[in-house]
Amino acid sequence: MVNEEMESSLKVIDVARVTPSNSDSSESLTLPLTFFDLLWYKLHAVERVIFYKLTDASRPFFDSVIVPNLKTSLSSSLSHYLPLAGKLVWEPLDPKPKIVYTPNDAVSFTVAESNADFSRLTGKEPFPTTELYPLVPELHVSDDSASAVSFQVTLFPNQGFCISVNAHHAVLDGKTTTNFLKSWARTCKNQDSFLPQDLIPVYDRTVIKDPMDLDTKILNAWHRVAKVFTGGKEPENPKSLKLLWSPEIGPDVFRYTLNLTREDIQKLRERLKKESSSSSVSSSPKELRLSTFVIVYSYALTCLIKARGGDPSRPVGYGFAVDCRSLMVPPVPSSYFGNCVSACFKMSLTAETFMSEEGFLAAARMVSDSVEALDENVALKIPEILEGFTTLSPGTQVLSVAGSTRFGVYGLDFGWGRPEKVVVVSIDQGEAISFAESRDGSGGVELGFSLKKHEMDVLVDLLHKGLEN
């Protein structure tokens, strides 16, 4: 994934093992995967890079202050989140994988130095996404075991540093990941191990009810999905924990971040109201749900489909993750550890719908209806979602969302201020758009895109022109 030229911009100083602190870490812990975890167990890991601007970041300061503080606080935080130091395994006689932590298990913590241009990686102009890859630590995954998470901290001398997280999606969802990062940041900044109740993880798996045997249905669906990737052949090892094949990303794939202000979003809201009232298309019986998510996602996916261009009859689809904690009956605690995320997908669409004059409005109607239809039954549809990918037409453009404006990633202060930029690197592995709250806390939305250069040029133009009109 990382070529020699990129590797030369990075010097690895140390690769350490960080173990959880305190006496609790002397106890073993086993957590079975739930059906929510199994939805994600073959998908690519989630890679985040959090940049901090710090012109005082000399190598001596990095070595003597930043790295020791991060390692000590990481060890302390892991004592509350023991499964992160453990491994994902699938024993021969077990019906499904489980997370196992045993004393002396540890996370990998890489310390590195980069001569890359910090301001370019955190700036507003598009740049090759492969420039981010040296900053992301490897995550060990083999047939019989997988690490839960790995970390890397990289110095950009006299510019700043970044903290990178590579997280296995079967172990934790975005909510759990950001809860852990908030715990780590708080511990590092305050130099104490106290955590408020909302950051203390809940490990009780009985809060996830499975009366429909979704576990088995999801594993069977994954078996059929795997056969699509092997040309119809039976997988050699049905219990392999190796992730699905991911595409090789070349130097022609570019990364771009768009900041939509609250005013931009309001402008798009008014445009949808106006288009809806004067639309030639028969109105939906339901009123449009013009939430920030509906507006922003509809706008982004419309621009992405237009940027791809091509045959208007080509197949497209869209989807987004759904946090089910509050949808479940009874509700699942907000600090539940693991995955409590399903997904909503709408397939069998054509590009023509979005490329037309009223494409933005058509997208908003569909996304609005998708959001309005969400209830506790969204979890029951997981096997159906996976089955849908076995019959997908080749070349279908399927757009999705990574992250959320609710995670509060720009509040991750480890003691050196707010992040300069937070990047979800793993959107390269699928046509995903990353979502985060705006850095300035003004109610805007930050979107991340990853596209081939020629499409990115068109996309940037479409995104900005749409806001001008």
Curated annotation (Swiss-Prot):
Enzyme Commission number(s): 2.3.1.-, 2.3.1.116
Presence of the UniProt keyword Zinc in the record: no
Keyword Acetylation appears in the UniProt entry: yes
InterPro entries on file: CAT-like_dom_sf (IPR023213), Plant_metabolite_acyltrans (IPR051504)
Placement of sequence motif HXXXD motif: 169-173
Reaction equation(s) it catalyzes: a flavonol 3-O-beta-D-glucoside + malonyl-CoA = a flavonol 3-O-(6-O-malonyl-beta-D-glucoside) + CoA; a flavonol 7-O-beta-D-glucoside + malonyl-CoA = a flavonol 7-O-(6-O-malonyl-beta-D-glucoside) + CoA
Domain of life: Eukaryota
Protein residues bound to malonyl-CoA: S291, T292
Molecular function GO terms recorded: flavonol-3-O-beta-glucoside O-malonyltransferase activity; O-malonyltransferase activity
PANTHER family with a match to the protein in the record: PTHR31625
Protein name as annotated: Phenolic glucoside malonyltransferase 1
Organism: Arabidopsis thaliana
